[in-house]
């Protein structure tokens, strides 16, 4: 899959099949998109931020990214203020800054300008500045490793915020045939096994991490 793609050269032809799967839902009117990306979940969230910015629906995304490795993107000192975030936490991704998208970075490795801690903790600093009316306007969109997604789901549970998670799973066929990427999902009618490639990769946070799990 990815190894074969990495060997392609400019001008090579590729056959694609799609669209397949279920993406993020943006139907909630006039909401505030809060984007959380970690590790290999950073690139898709960057594209999501740009997509939301260009929707022409008046949406103003706010992005938080976390990594324990040096960020593989040019970082800059942000000139965009974010309430609840200390002034010394000012590192942003240059592409986000150029598109006027508020953004902050987090890491446990004390990178310059980054929040020292988990990216979900950084997002919570901002969330705590909001009143109940503002909280109801938020939708969290997250992509990253499972512990980060669980923490994002916990944010949603704690503050009663809608939260959607894009899962990372190994996929063999990626068209729903092999069932190699199934995850356990809790639905109103009970527990079911869903394929991330065609039933996801995006799921409601509480279906992946029910309340009993977010509190663990």
What is each stretch, according to the model?
Residues 1-34:
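FAD-binding FR-type
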Residues 44-56:
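Histidine-anchored nucleotide/phosphate-binding helix
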Residues 64, 69-216:
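Reductase modules of NAD(P)H-dependent flavoproteins
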Residues 28, 56, 133-135:
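Short, flexible coil/linker segments at domain boundaries that flank nucleotide/cofactor-interacting
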Residues 30, 54-61:
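Conserved S-adenosyl-L-methionine
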Residues 32-43:
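Short, glycine-rich nucleotide/cofactor-binding loops
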Residues 26, 45-47, 151-153:
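Short glycine-/acidic-enriched loop or helix-start segments at secondary-structure transitions
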């Amino acid at each position: 899959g990815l190894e074969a793609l990495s060997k392609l050269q400019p001008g090579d032809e590729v056959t694609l099949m799609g669209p397949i799967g279920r993406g993020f839902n943006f139907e909630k009117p006039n909401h505030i998109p809060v984007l959380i990306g970690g590790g290999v979940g950073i690139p898709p969230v960057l594209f999501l931020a740009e997509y939301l910015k260009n929707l022409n629906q008046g949406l103003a995304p706010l992005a938080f990214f976390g990594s324990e490795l040096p960020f593989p993107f040019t970082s800059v000192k942000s000139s965009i203020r974010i309430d609840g975030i200390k002034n010394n936490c000012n590192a942003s991704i240059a592409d986000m800054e150029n598109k006027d998208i508020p953004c902050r970075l987090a890491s446990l490795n004390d990178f310059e300008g980054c929040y020292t801690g988990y990216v979900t903790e950084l997002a919570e600093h901002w969330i705590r500045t909001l009143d109940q009316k503002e909280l109801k306007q938020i939708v969290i969109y997250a992509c990253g490793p499972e512990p980060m997604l669980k923490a994002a789901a916990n944010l949603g549970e704690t503050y009663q915020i809608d939260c959607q998670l894009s899962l990372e799973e190994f996929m063999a066929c990626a068209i729903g045939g092999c069932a190699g990427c199934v995850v356990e999902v809790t639905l109103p009618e009970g527990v079911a096994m869903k394929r991330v490639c065609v039933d996801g990769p995006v799921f409601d946070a509480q279906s992946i991490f029910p309340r009993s799990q977010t509190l663990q």
